[in-house]
Every structure is written in C-alpha cells, then in structure tokens.
C-alpha cells in the first residue's frame, strides 16, 4: 500500500438526533464535538438525522405503494376497466 494516500480512519460515536440512539463505528468523518462511550474513552461525536433506530425500513413502519401498475392506473384514469 502506498503511504499518505489513504484517509484517516478512526472510531467515532454516531448519535441519532431523533431518538438519542448511539453506536460506535469507524469513519473518516471528523467532528469537534466529543462524547464518552461505555468503555470510558472519549470519541468524536457525529449527529445524524436518520439511523437504523428511526428509519422506517428498519423499524417496520414502512408503507408500500399499493397504487397498482401503469396499466391499472391508465384504465382507472380513462374508465376503461370493466
């Protein structure tokens, strides 16, 4: 591997601003804010608006589009469905 071409990868705490859920992960993103993790160490804190704790796909609150296909929409629009 070449030296000095790879980004600095370090551990950070991601915090969901909607639920307060926090998890420790690796990232190249930097932050001026810091927080203490469960192991007693201090890590940079990155706040995110959506995480697996609040995203509808992961929470089971996702709604699927039940409008039908293009043909059904056309038939409904022009009253061709019988």
From Swiss-Prot:
It comes from the Bacteria. GO terms for molecular function: structural constituent of ribosome. GO terms for cellular component: ribonucleoprotein complex; ribosome. GO terms for biological process: translation. Gene3D superfamilies: Ribosomal protein L31. Signal peptide: none annotated. InterPro entries: Ribosomal_bL28/bL31-like_sf (IPR034704), Ribosomal_bL31 (IPR002150), Ribosomal_bL31_B (IPR027493), Ribosomal_bL31_sf (IPR042105). Keywords: Ribonucleoprotein, Ribosomal protein. It holds the Pfam family Ribosomal_L31. NCBIfam families: L31, PRK01678.1. Belongs to the bacterial ribosomal protein bL31 family. Type B subfamily. Part of the 50S ribosomal subunit. This is Large ribosomal subunit protein bL31B. It comes from Bacillus velezensis (strain DSM 23117 / BGSC 10A6 / LMG 26770 / FZB42) (Bacillus amyloliquefaciens subsp. plantarum).
């Amino acid at each position: 591997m070449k030296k000095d071409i790879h980004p600095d990868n370090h551990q950070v705490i991601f915090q969901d601003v909607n639920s307060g859920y926090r998890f420790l992960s690796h990232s190249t993103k930097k932050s001026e804010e810091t927080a203490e993790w469960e192991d007693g160490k201090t890590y940079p804190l990155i706040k995110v608006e959506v995480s697996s704790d609040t995203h509808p796909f992961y929470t089971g609150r996702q709604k699927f589009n039940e409008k039908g296909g293009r043909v059904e929409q056309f038939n409904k629009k022009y009253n061709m469905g019988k």
